């Protein structure tokens, strides 16, 4: 562990702020003139809203899903926009003095921050909904489960962050290697595959976050 | 980095991805088999089956990706160098 230094990653912060700004503009444009018969952008946003609501409702349950829908939706949209923004916007054209711009989620700091947010929120969801009875979950079927359940609290953010980080980085690396070997045409299908997997990873991140929150608020009988 | 550490790191990086790909490969094969059987039995449920299949594929794939992360750490951010 000799030369692991703390490094600030301005490139990741910069791209995530740019993408967040784009997302904000996109959503405020879509909700500016709301009509009864949605069309165009408003239609798309309503479709997204429905999608996120269904996701939250199936994972968290009818009773409390409304409290957590904004969080799940934010996670989904942020991860989705980061993944696609990193792949679709030609960041390579912008030269930086140090580091390079790319998908914010290809940076381990971003994904660990998101995963820790998920951890905090499922603890908060459990404690605020059930009080101290939340800790019954740790000894739920039998007290033998206690060490495993405690270990799970550490592996959840670990797997959540590494899954997202690894997938996005792997996409970028595969495209990079292919562009290095065959610069023409051949990388294009792989790029589409990358877009597809990044969309699925955003969905998985949001689904798992919702599932963990749902697990914490679930009533045992 | 001395040569024995770098050699061991490269071998370990290869093994991490290679061995990590075995389990998820078998798992994805099983899942695809189940999905094909399901579609053959009930062609009208194809859309639902495909969605679930892709979601579970991504879960299995992430196991190999963990191996890839370990391999990348060994190659580019080796803690023992």
Curated annotation (Swiss-Prot), chain B:
Keyword match Ion transport: yes
Domain of life: Bacteria
Listed GO MF terms: lipid binding; proton-transporting ATP synthase activity, rotational mechanism
Localization annotation: Cellular thylakoid membrane
Site (Reversibly protonated during proton transport): 61
PROSITE patterns: ATPASE_C
Oligomer status and interactors: F-type ATPases have 2 components, F(1) - the catalytic core - and F(0) - the membrane proton channel. F(1) has five subunits: alpha(3), beta(3), gamma(1), delta(1), epsilon(1). F(0) has four main subunits: a(1), b(1), b'(1) and c(10-14). The alpha and beta chains form an alternating ring which encloses part of the gamma chain. F(1) is attached to F(0) by a central stalk formed by the gamma and epsilon chains, while a peripheral stalk is formed by the delta, b and b' chains.
Name this protein carries in UniProt: ATP synthase subunit c
Species this protein is from: Prochlorococcus marinus (strain MIT 9301)
């Amino acid at each position: 562990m000799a030369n692991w230094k703390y490094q600030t990653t301005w490139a990741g912060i910069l791209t995530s702020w740019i993408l967040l700004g784009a997302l904000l503009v996109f959503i405020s444009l879509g909700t500016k003139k709301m009509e009864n018969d949605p069309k165009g952008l408003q239609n798309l946003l309503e479709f997204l809203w429905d999608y996120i609501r269904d996701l939250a409702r199936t994972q968290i349950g009818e009773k409390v899903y409304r409290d957590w829908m904004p969080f799940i939706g934010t996670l989904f949209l942020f991860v989705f926009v980061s993944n696609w923004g990193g792949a679709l916007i030609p960041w390579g054209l912008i030269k930086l003095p140090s580091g390079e711009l790319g998908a914010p989620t290809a940076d381990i700091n971003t994904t660990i921050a998101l995963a820790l947010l998920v951890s905090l929120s499922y603890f908060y969801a459990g404690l605020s909904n059930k009080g101290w009875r939340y800790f019954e979950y740790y000894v739920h079927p039998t007290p033998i489960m206690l060490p495993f359940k405690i270990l799970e609290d550490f592996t959840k953010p670990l797997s959540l962050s590494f899954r997202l980080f690894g997938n996005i980085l792997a996409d970028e690396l595969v495209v990079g290697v292919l562009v290095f070997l065959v610069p023409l045409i051949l990388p294009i299908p792989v790029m589409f595959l990358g877009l597809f997997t990044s969309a699925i990873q955003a969905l998985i991140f949001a689904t798992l976050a919702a599932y963990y929150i749902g697990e914490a608020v679930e009533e045992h009988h | 980095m001395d040569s024995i550490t770098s050699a061991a790191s490269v071998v370990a990086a290869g093994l991490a991805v290679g061995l990590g790909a075995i389990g998820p490969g078998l798992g994805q094969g099983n899942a695809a088999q189940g999905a094909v059987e399901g579609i053959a039995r009930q062609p009208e449920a194809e859309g639902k089956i495909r969605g679930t299949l892709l979601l579970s594929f991504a879960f299995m794939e992430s196991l190999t990706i963990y191996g890839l992360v370990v391999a990348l750490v060994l190659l580019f951010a080796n803690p023992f160098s």
